[in-house]
């Protein structure tokens, strides 16, 4: 049984700002994604889900190299399913058109991937270096994560 009952809209901005201020800029994306996965896993656990599903595809962007996905997975205790993993961009666009998400995906707006993007993001992250960089957040991250989780907006989705 799939556990897709609702959507969680997380205000991640304060976490992003802390990462931006305290961590090496070439590691911004991978560190942000690791904290996003931790938050996603929190809600999946809360909803008694058995895994996370993402829309990543190998090589589409810097954060979707094999090494980057491994670094992202490293923070998760539950399985991460990636049904699009080997599809090319055109296949993914076709699917997004079929499930009526394409038009939303191309809207021009600033999000975490455009505002906090590194000029030269790491594509082969070293997990030990990433963990060392994350230690720079130790004084603030627990409170920031708690606030992000506590202020999350939950949007109920009709099962049909």
Indicate residue ranges for each PLM-predicted region.
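Active-site adenylate/phosphate-handling loop in enzymes that bind or generate adenylated species
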Residues: 16, 21-94, 98-99, 144, ...
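Conserved beta-strand segments of alpha/beta enzyme cores
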Residues: 6-8, 79
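Short active-site-adjacent structural elements
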Residues: 61-63, 89-93, 105, 114, ...
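Generic beta-strand/beta-sheet core signal
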Residues: 10-13, 54-55, 83, 106-107, ...
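A short alpha-helix-loop-beta-strand transition element characteristic
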Residues: 100-108
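The feature marks non-catalytic terminal segments
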Residues: 107-160
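A generic structural signal for well-ordered coil/turn residues at beta-strand boundaries
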Residues: 6, 48, 109-112
């Amino acid at each position: 049984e799939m556990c897709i009952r609702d959507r969680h809209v997380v205000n991640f901005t304060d976490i992003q700002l802390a990462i931006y201020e305290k961590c090496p800029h070439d590691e911004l994306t991978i560190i942000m994604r690791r904290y996003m996965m931790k938050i996603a896993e929190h809600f999946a656990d809360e909803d008694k889900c058995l895994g996370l599903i993402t829309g990543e595809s190998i090589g589409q962007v810097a954060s979707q190299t094999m090494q980057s996905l491994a670094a992202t997975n490293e923070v998760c205790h539950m399985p991460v399913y990636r049904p699009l993993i080997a599809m090319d961009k055109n296949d993914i666009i076709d699917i997004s058109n079929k499930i009526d998400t394409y038009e939303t995906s191309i809207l021009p707006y600033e999000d975490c991937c455009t505002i906090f993007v590194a000029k030269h993001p790491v594509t082969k992250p070293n997990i030990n270096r990433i963990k060392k960089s994350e230690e720079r957040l130790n004084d603030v991250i627990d409170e920031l994560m708690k606030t992000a989780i506590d202020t999350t907006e939950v949007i109920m989705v009709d099962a049909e």
